[in-house]
Amino acid sequence: MSNNRRRGPMGGPGRGMAPGEKAKDLKGTMVKLIKYMRRFYVPIVMVIIFAIASTVFNIVGPTILGDATTEIFKGLVHKVSGGSGIDFDKVTHILLMLLSLYVASAIFSFIQGLIMTHVSNNVSYQMRKDISEKIHRMPMKYFESRTYGEVLSRVTNDVDTLGQSLNQSMTQIITSTTQIVGVFIMMIRISIPMTIAVLLTLPLSMGLIGLIMSKSQPYFKAQQKHLGELNGQVEEIYSGHNIVKAFNKEESVIEEFKEVNGKLYNSAWRSQFFSGAMMPLMQFVGNLGYVAVTILGGYLAIKKTIEVGQIQSFLQYVRNFSQPITQLAQVGNMMQTTAASAERVFEFLEEEEEIEVEKDAVPVDTLAGNVTFEHVNFGYNKDQTIINDFSVDVKEGQKVAIVGPTGAGKTTLIKLLMRFYDVNGGCIKVDGQDIREFKRSDLREMFGMVLQDTWLYNASIRDNIRYGKLDASEEEIQGAARAAYAHHFIETQPGGYDMEINEESNNISQGQKQLLTIARAILADPKILILDEATSSVDTRTEERIQMAMDNLMQGRTSFVIAHRLSTIKDADVILVMNHGDIVEQGNHEELLAKGGFYADLYNSQFENA
């Protein structure tokens, strides 16, 4: 899609927010995530069952292998003593049983991996779907107070991180927990003294894990934050690349990028350093336990209180006992990132939505288009009022022009009329009904808009025009294009109406974009028309043609025209002259010129050289 403004289709105040905060409420966020995943209850239960089964079969394996070792050892001893030697049939039977267990374990592990991948991808899909639907229910003020990068980060970085970490961590938690419990039971069965020797290393392991996690958490937090900042900066620079070039700001932009990229690098390598240090340290501690068990096992074997095969099994269990503890520690680190991403997603999904009238909403089908502003007051924040006690009565079919300097409140009036924002005081009525009594969607269906910043999406010219009326016929589409004086240039394009407009809409000129948006508005056939600098981006000849088409379109419709080029609104029925949120003058073109006031000064300043 192409939208040439960063903060919303009609501008407004904006500020950036630093994304990527660490989860403020780890427990609460994980509870929300578990509740969110309830819809996948059945496959998750299957994952748990298959993961436990796979792990249990693996746990039993060393014991069976130990039995084979014991059998071979006893056979060798008997052979030396003049006995029958090794019972190969029994050993073969044991090994076949072991092979069957490992094959079954691998199959169960493969199945649970497939199911978990399906679950994690479904969670990501559902979250993106929920976020996409949520976006369309959010008030305009949300997007005008945040950068594109922050909002996009929720849909891309956070959801991707969440899906990947779920896929890795969920099965790891199940298998590691099962393995710790199962291996502990098997070690107890073999030898309590050797088990105690292993357990003595646990406090050291836990202490190291706690130390590493406490050191790494701030860096993981900073990494997510700087990644969000970097994404926002890249998007911002790319969308404004022409401006950067025009003002020779390449070096400045590169330095800013290097600064943020450097912060990301520093936080990333530190977080990965601490995370990577966990495995070697845990292996070191595990080796200490391994040595202790070897010495103690040799002593017990000499005392003939334990078999050689049992020592071998126990040594394997020592390895299998320390490994899942390390894995759980790594999962703990991963869950910090998971929780941070999940919290940001849930924060967005829980954001306040536009208030919609659900019951007894007034229908818009019979409305004619009389618009009344009654003592309207509004400000984007409590400290600054933009519209002050604004009142005007617009009759059906009138062409109303709104003029004034930048910041006078012209575009804000349109936002209020379409309920992108609600008034702080007073009311706006259409045919005597407060617009807050309509459904927002019904109210906005009454309007056709042509904005100063064109919005086209990556599709054919035909589909972009049809956006104004999705069920329009080919004849209607071409009729709208002709009325907007766009048909000729469309026919000269490769493919005509089938030509694809690229993602940035830079394969057609700015004036051609404007013509297509006007054609789209004509096709929509609205009751109320809004033109916000509709001809400001085209040349004089095109402007004249568009103006004639607009005059035909506005015939019989209530129309609001916002323009700085006063030549386009001389024939308006009413001209509202705004300054600092107030109507300072009101009347038609001749009346306002005769007054010699603010409008006359604006007009004369534009045409003094004519």
Where are these regions (language model features)?
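Short intracellular "coupling" helices and adjacent cytoplasmic loop segments at the cytosolic face
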Residues: 16-21, 121, 129-153, 157-159, ...
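A short amphipathic helical element positioned immediately N-terminal to and/or at the very start
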Residues: 26-41, 151
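ABC-type nucleotide-binding domain
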Residues: 350, 357-358, 364-610
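Hydrophobic alpha-helical transmembrane segments of ABC transporter permease domains
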Residues: 38, 96, 108, 112, ...
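Transmembrane helices of ABC transporter permease
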Residues: 39, 43-56, 67, 168-222, ...
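Helix-loop-helix
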Residues: 186-200, 210, 270-343, 348-349
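An intracellular "coupling" helix at the cytosolic face of ABC transporter transmembrane type-1 domains
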Residues: 140-141, 159-166, 170, 174, ...
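Transmembrane helix-loop-helix hairpins at lipid-water interfaces of multipass membrane proteins
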Residues: 2, 44-108, 188-193, 304-308
